[in-house]
């Protein structure tokens, strides 16, 4: 009986881990979070609606398409915006990185603010989201290399560029995972991380406990098993997707802004 129980428990854990992986990471699975309206597009709720509406119109009317090819062969899309002021300062850029289940449009308000301050603004689509190719979301770990390549696109066209990185939610974690990498060009002079998370593993454990009412031990086991599936399918483990090692090596000024937790903890 004990053996049967063990086999059944192992099977249930494996099934739960597989479900978690597909729900949280696989953007092509029709039952994943990416096909459900679990996260509101406006992460700031009803705040500054007038400004948001103006920014959305500006975003739609002035966006210029741009694209790169990722290191693993995916075509990544983004939008470029000219400064929206009379006498912009040359060579200053802001890259606004959207979050989990998001799109560049969710950064419209911030992109417009930076453009009005004289920045040339880039708002990329994260891999496997919006217009960019890919199937699996990297929780910032895979996306950090994509962000480095977007930075390189700017630096290659303007070697005097001074770049500000801004990210919200998973975009904030992408920024944090990028700032401490040895490849980061000196052109990146500052970063802002809004409502990011430090570890994908801990984020998923907290989410599993909150959404599915799992005990902590079971949630940890399920997430760790899902991480093994993720390693095989997407090329990374949830334990790798942590910004703490990067932040230890970050030397540029960085502002951290912590807001209320979003649904699914992201």
Predicted segments with their positions:
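An N-terminal hydrophobic leader/cap segment in hydrolases
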Residues: 3-69
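Alpha/beta-hydrolase active-site loop
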Residues: 137-158
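Glycine-rich nucleophile elbow surrounding the catalytic serine of serine-hydrolase chemistry
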Residues: 167-177
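Hydrolase active-site cap/lid region
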Residues: 177-239, 245
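Serine-hydrolase catalytic core
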Residues: 68-70, 76, 224, 230-266
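Short beta-strand element of the alpha/beta-hydrolase
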Residues: 90-99
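Conserved alpha/beta-hydrolase
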Residues: 111-133
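Alpha/beta-hydrolase fold nucleophile elbow
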Residues: 157-169
């Amino acid at each position: 009986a004990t053996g049967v129980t063990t086999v059944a428990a192992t099977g249930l854990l494996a099934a739960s881990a597989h479900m978690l992986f597909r729900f949280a990471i696989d953007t092509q699975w029709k039952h994943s979070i990416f096909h459900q309206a679990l996260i509101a597009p406006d992460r700031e709720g009803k705040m500054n609606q007038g400004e948001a509406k103006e920014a959305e119109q500006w975003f739609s009317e002035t966006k210029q398409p741009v694209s790169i090819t990722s290191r693993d062969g995916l075509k990544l899309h983004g939008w470029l915006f000219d400064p929206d002021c009379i006498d912009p300062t040359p060579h200053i850029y802001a890259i606004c990185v959207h979050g989990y289940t998001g799109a560049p449009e969710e950064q419209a308000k911030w992109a417009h603010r930076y453009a009005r301050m004289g920045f040339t603004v880039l708002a990329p689509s994260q891999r496997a989201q919006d217009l960019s190719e890919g199937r699996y979301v990297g929780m910032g770990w895979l996306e950090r290399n994509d962000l480095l390549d977007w930075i390189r696109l700017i630096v290659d066209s303007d070697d005097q560029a001074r770049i500000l990185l801004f990210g919200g939610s998973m975009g904030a974690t992408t920024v944090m995972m990028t700032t401490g990498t040895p490849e980061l060009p000196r052109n990146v002079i500052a970063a802002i991380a809004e409502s990011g998370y430090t570890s994908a593993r801990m984020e998923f454990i907290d989410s599993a406990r909150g959404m599915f009412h799992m005990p902590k031990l079971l949630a940890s086991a399920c997430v760790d098993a899902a991480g093994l599936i993720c390693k095989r399918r997407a090329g990374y483990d949830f334990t790798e997707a942590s910004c703490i090692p990067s932040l230890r090596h970050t030397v540029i000024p960085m502002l951290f802004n912590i807001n209320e937790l979003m649904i699914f903890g992201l």
